[in-house]
Amino acid sequence: MFFAPQSIINFINISVEVQTVRDKLSVLKEYFGHDSFREGQDRITDSLLGGRDVLGIMPTGAGKSICYQVPALMFDGITIVVSPLISLMKDQVSALVQSGVAAAYINSSLTHAQYLKVLQNTESGKYKIIYVAPERLCAPAFLGICRNLNISMVAVDEAHCVSQWGQDFRPSYLKIPDFIDALNSRPVVGAFTATATGAVRDDIKTLLRLVSPLVVTTGFDRPNLFFSVMQPKNKSIELMKLIKERKNESGIVYCSTRKAVEEVCELLQKNGFAATRYHAGLDENERRRNQDDFVYDRATIMVATNAFGMGIDKSNVSFVIHYNMPKNMESYYQEAGRAGRDGRNADCILLYSAKDVRTNQFLINNSEPNPDLTEDEQEEVRRRDRERLKQMTFYCTTHKCLRKFILEYFGDKGPERCEKCSNCLSNHENTDITVDAQKIMSCVARTGQRYGKKVICDVLRGSKNERLISAGLSRQSTYGIMADCPEKRLRDIIDHLCENGYMTAQGDEYPILKLAPKSRGVLTGQETLRMMLEIPQKKKAAAAKDAPLPPADEKLLAALKDLRKSLAMRQSIPAYVVFTDATLIDMCRLKPKTQEEFIEVSGVGQAKSQRYGEFFLAVIAEFSE
């Protein structure tokens, strides 16, 4: 075994390890087939190569893995990647091996014999990159081997899991600094996450004990994603319509409960769609089998709870539909971000109903207590979860640009209108709602600030509901004063007043409307209010589609996909690990004739060119004659 001298692997002098003769761009091209770095990747790579810790906050699909994989191939030593995601480890290791990189993973999916084999190979220095589940880091056998190895870097994926205020807190992440401290010398550390508020970012830096880290935020925008919120009367009918419009496309349908997953999956299967399911109630073998069916394109649609998808690197997901509203914006954006990872246009559609809010309130209030938190801390977590749910609800009811709402939530800036969301493409007009707001606020005040949205709407619209009448609410002066106002419009105005601080909705399961101090100016006529309200005729909100290929190239693309599928099946790997759809489309456009031209295709590296070039060039040649 090779024992690196202390002077070489010392943290302060870690840059000595860098193979400076190898240009990072040549590594990027040779192994990953890319000619240039994306936004942020260059700075992060330079920082890690120079021995400075990094906190990288980059949206899903922005190429976080490149940020540590390129330096890993330039360091003399080994890189340890900490990841909580078994499926992602498997896919990324497969992709690295396909690209000519010696890599392995250690997690609970390995048999004891496989685990011992990986340890043996690790000890003999056979791997350049090792993915490890956080629970396995401090295992005596693994830690004992690592103490004697030249470990150049530790990369922490899904770093928000270290924070108890994050949406995926995992106590095992708190052990990562102990693992690093137990090594003979401190490696450079990179922490990466797709979604992190300011509080979570501070936690990551503190709890992972990052040393003067370079913080790189590339922006949260995913320009190729089209965001849409719908409030259908019948979700199942609307879902079938959406799926039929996307026939043969790969997509994910997220549901909030196991029961909903079963019902939606059965609905899709009965209507002839190749759908499968994933939730925590299934045994591990079935979950793995169903996940593989989706990853290997045997099933085109995955219906799942949020237990699925955080570690799925499937590049050709063209739509994500949320059948139910998630609990918070962090979860929503991460799950929606599974779409369009290949850079092609994709749809992110949320089907909203008020029932979703109540379901999530129930889940928050009845969540399993965390034994690592005190009761006061647990209550604070619930309070923050309720606040995040409120923001998620505002997203579903807002009339402003959905992309702008998302970006502002994460502290980023966006245009007033993106023209690539359902709100921007819907037919709304800027409407004076001052009088309507006064009527609503007056009703809330005159009924004693004791009722929720439904009752207030019923009073204002003059409902003949017996319970309302028996409660004496029909005798209120505000009873029926908005009888001509459609219920949806009335609810939209109430949501707008709550979202902008003129009223509050207090309580969890059945929120009560109350006036906020800000309402005084409106009630006294000193302030006017306007909002974007939908007018009857509405443009169809449809995502921008990728420019179509010529008919001849469409046939070539189909042939290339068939070849890719055949090659993938022979190796028992997902098709997108061979080449992504975006790479196949680039082949159709460039139509390379030689190995030299083939390697110029985006996404084709040296190893893949040698492994697959002759097969793909032969098919391209057939269509070029």
Tell me the role of every PLM-derived stretch.
Residues 7, 14-31, 35, 39, ...:
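Helicase motor core with emphasis on the C-terminal RecA-like subdomain
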Residues 8-24, 358-359, 370-375, 384-386, ...:
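Accessory DNA-binding and partner-docking regions appended to nucleic-acid-acting proteins
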Residues 48, 243, 294, 396, ...:
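Short helix-to-turn junction characteristic of helix-turn-helix DNA-binding domains
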Residues 185, 247, 399, 449, ...:
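Flexible coil/turn residues that form the inter-helical turn or adjacent wing/linker of helix-turn-helix
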Residues 380-410:
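Short, charged low-complexity linear segments at domain edges
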